Amino acid sequence: ANMTTLTYQLSRSLAHRFAPGDEIIISRMEHEGNVSPWLQMAQDRDLTVRWLDFDRDSWCVEPESLKPLLNERTKLLALNYASNMTGGVNDVKALASLAREAGALVYVDAVQFASHRLIDVKDLGVDFLACSPYKYFGPHLGVVYGRRDLLESLHAYKLRCASEDLPYRFSVG
C-alpha cells in the first residue's frame, strides 16, 4: 500500500478512539493523502475539524499558530514535515510537543522530507510518521512508523491478514 492508503487504514482504526464533538486539527499545507482520510473519519464520527494555517512569509506552520486551536477536545494533529507545495519545513518537534501536551495524537506526513534528512521519530515525539520509499529510490509503497503501544491497541480493518502480529497486522494476504 502507498502512504495515502496506509493513512486511510490507520484513520479507520483510530476512529473508534474518538467521540462526537472531539476535534482534530489538519494543517492547510497538507497533501491530499493527509487530508481526506481525516475528513472522512471526522464525518463518520461527528468530529469537529479545525484548520491550522501556515505563515505566508516562512511558508511553515508556526507553533504559535497551533496554540489557540488546542483544547481538551483536541484528539489529533495531522501535519506534514515538509510541504510539497511550498518546500517549507515545519518544526515538527515543537508542534508535536504542543499537541501531545494537550493530549492529542500526532500524525506526520514525511513523504517530502524523508529523502533529505534522517528522522528520529522518538526524538520528535510523534505517534505516527508516514513516508514513501520511492522518494528515496525505494519501491513505490508506503511506510508508517507507529508507537508500538498504539499499534497494538488498534484493530486493523482488512479483508484478510497474514498475521495479527506487528508489523503484519495491517497487511492483507
Label every model-predicted segment.
Residues A1-G173:
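Pyridoxal 5′-phosphate
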